[in-house]
Amino acid sequence: MPLKKAVYPGSFDPITYGHIDIIERGLKVFDTVIVAVARNSEKNSLFNVEERIALIREVLGDNSRAKVDTFDGLLVDYVRKQGATVIIRGLRAVSDFEYEFQLAQMNRSITQEVETLFMMTSVPYSYLSSSIVKEVSSLNGPIDGLVPPLVKKALDAKFNRS
């Protein structure tokens, strides 16, 4: 039986406990989850791609079933090149659904070889986003419980706090 691979794409700027929750739950369904960090020049990122990859790898530790990679261009092309058949997307609220639905339908119109699997975020993370974490952190607000300690430390360094 072939191994089932899924791709979990995003900017992960920075990775949060919400992202980690989706990755861990994805690993219960798939043999391998590829965390694919988007090289998106249109987004104004706090962490560069290499920093985001390093944080994700450190957070995931030595889990051999979770891979970290980058991609640019069409997501479905990347998914096919990886030999994966599923894109995992996390949904926090109804407001996420319409945008994610449109992306899934567009991907489906490009290729029917790739499915999109929506995973509802766990309740404690239903409001959580990287943008909220960055904003609260930039104002020296508490982000404990939102990101792992090493991510908090990296955010403190970005905002010149030690």
From Swiss-Prot:
> Which co-factors does it depend on?
Mg(2+)
Q: In which pathway does it act?
A: Cofactor biosynthesis; coenzyme A biosynthesis; CoA from (R)-pantothenate: step 4/5
One biological process term from GO is: coenzyme A biosynthetic process
Alphabetically sorted, this entry's keywords are:
ATP-binding, Coenzyme A biosynthesis, Cytoplasm, Magnesium, Nucleotide-binding, Nucleotidyltransferase, Transferase
What reaction does this enzyme carry out catalytically? (R)-4'-phosphopantetheine + ATP + H(+) = 3'-dephospho-CoA + diphosphate
Q: Which GO terms describe its cellular component?
A: cytoplasm
A GO molecular function annotation here is: pantetheine-phosphate adenylyltransferase activity
| Subcellular localization, as worded in the UniProt entry | Cytoplasm
Q: Where does substrate bind?
A: 11, 43, 75, 89
The site annotation (Transition state stabilizer) covers 19
EC number(s) on record? 2.7.7.3
The enzyme's main class, written as a single word, is transferase
Q: Name the SUPFAM superfamilies for this protein.
A: Nucleotidylyl transferase
- Residues annotated to bind ATP: 11-12, 19, 90-92, 100, 125-131
The record's subunit annotation is: Homohexamer.
State the family named in the UniProt similarity comment for this chain. Answer: Belongs to the bacterial CoaD family.
Its biological purpose: Reversibly transfers an adenylyl group from ATP to 4'-phosphopantetheine, yielding dephospho-CoA (dPCoA) and pyrophosphate.
Record's protein name:
Phosphopantetheine adenylyltransferase
In which organism is this protein found? Geotalea uraniireducens (strain Rf4)
* Protein encoded by which gene: coaD
